[in-house]
């Protein structure tokens, strides 16, 4: 087993073996974000679902009110006058057959892919390349749309797509260590409400198994989910 650095050992010593109140957990994670860069703050949610069943799958979007603190490179597959609309709205890449071809060759210098419905038959052929990376456009996620300007604006402002993995775990970044504790709490609360609102119809028993938050280089801290759910929306 690899030996832990003194920094990590010291940070781990600050985290008690217990469940923390939401704001307390956020403050501790911020305190432990001691790397020389602005660490990303992430939430890891274990849900009581089995995604191999279609009625227990979770895939949706969340619009974080305080944003993510990260720039998002957006590519758009469309054609005609929509190409100009995409570029004007702020897409880093916009193309039709040429972009489809370059993606097929593995050239993917973007974080999010949006497509207009008329291009989806061609985009669908890229499933083998896009699927494993979670980049395949999907109507439920708002990444298949004719309103490109609105979609690009929303994703640039902090809208995120997320899904439960095969183990029923959701991984979502919800801010930066430089954010205030209140801003991070507002984002985390919004994420919790989104997960509850989109509970799969086939979910049985206890829905929330656990919620941990962590920074890029710091230890994870368990959050009291019930306490988070009890926070008023205007907190």
From Swiss-Prot:
Cellular compartments per GO CC: large ribosomal subunit
CDD domains: Ribosomal_L1
Stretches of the chain forming a coiled coil according to its record: none
GO biological process entries: regulation of translation; translation
Gene3D superfamilies found in the cross-reference section: 3.30.190.20, 3.40.50.790
Keywords: Repressor, Ribonucleoprotein, Ribosomal protein, RNA-binding, rRNA-binding, Translation regulation, tRNA-binding
Function according to Swiss-Prot or TrEMBL: Binds directly to 23S rRNA. The L1 stalk is quite mobile in the ribosome, and is involved in E site tRNA release. Protein L1 is also a translational repressor protein, it controls the translation of the L11 operon by binding to its mRNA.
Family, per entry: Belongs to the universal ribosomal protein uL1 family.
NCBIfam families: rplA_bact
Name the record gives this protein: Large ribosomal subunit protein uL1
Organism from which the protein derives: Prochlorococcus marinus (strain MIT 9303)
Organism lineage: Bacteria, Bacillati, Cyanobacteriota, Cyanophyceae, Synechococcales
């Amino acid at each position: 087993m690899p030996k832990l650095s003194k920094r990590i050992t010291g940070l781990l010593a600050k985290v008690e073996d217990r469940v923390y109140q939401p704001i307390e957990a956020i403050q501790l994670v911020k305190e432990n974000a001691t790397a020389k860069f602005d660490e990303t703050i992430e939430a890891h949610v274990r849900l009581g679902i089995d995604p191999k069943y279609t009625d227990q799958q979770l895939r949706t979007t969340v619009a974080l009110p305080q944003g993510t603190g990260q720039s998002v490179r957006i590519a758009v597959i469309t054609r005609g006058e929509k190409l100009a609309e995409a570029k004007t709205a702020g897409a880093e890449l916009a193309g039709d057959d040429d972009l489809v071809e370059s993606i097929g060759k593995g050239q993917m210098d973007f974080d999010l892919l949006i497509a207009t419905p008329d291009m989806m038959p061609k985009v669908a052929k890229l499933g083998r390349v896009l699927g494993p990376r979670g980049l395949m456009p999907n109507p439920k996620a708002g990444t298949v749309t004719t309103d490109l300007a609105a979609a690009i604006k929303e994703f640039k402002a902090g809208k995120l797509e997320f899904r439960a993995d095969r183990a029923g775990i959701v991984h979502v970044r919800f801010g930066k260590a430089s954010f205030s504790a209140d801003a991070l709490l507002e984002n985390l609360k919004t994420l919790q409400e989104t997960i509850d609102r989109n509970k799969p119809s086939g979910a049985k028993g206890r829905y929330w198994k656990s919620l941990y938050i962590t920074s890029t280089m710091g230890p994870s801290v368990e959050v009291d989910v019930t306490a988070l759910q009890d926070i008023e929306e205007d907190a």
